[in-house]
Amino acid sequence: PHRPAGGYPLKNLSGVGVAFKLAAALTDSQEDILARYADMVCLGTVADVMPLTGENRVFVSRGLSMLRHNPRPGIAALMAEGGCQPEQMNASSVGYVLAPRINAAGRMGNIPVAVELFLTQDPDRARVLAEELCRMNRERQSVESEIYAQAVQMLPQGAAPAAIVLAEESWHQGVVGIVASRIAEE
């Protein structure tokens, strides 16, 4: 969607949206693919903080319906572990409860846990995986807080410089981007 000569009308299509469009084109069945994977497209769209307009709005609406009425075992376990009631799922629940826990797997270097959570059909295994993602998210939050405190101590005093470059060899590479964003906002 970002190709200058592409002409695609929705410029804010997330990576999962592009993957969905590719799968739909390869199978020649957008409706079947969306019916099977609307929850995944919803999760990725909201997690990537895409505007909920156009196709993104359709993806999220259909995905939320799936999350409310027929969630995959892993997602159901993650909702339960995060304190979400299926019938009350909305974009905020996805963005502030589910997405950070799923993203924690990648940030903390253990992506297979999230992948298995998406794929498992065993509710007991799903619960164990959801608990692990929640544990990783708490660890990510702790590491983030530590790095943030260290980074703030390193900031120059006085007027804000045009650019700030901070580094520490021990900082976890999966979390420094979040800390950098927080510091840039301040």
Predicted ranges, named:
Residues 27-186:
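Hydrophobic helix-and-loop "lid/oligomerization" segment in the mid-to-C-terminal part
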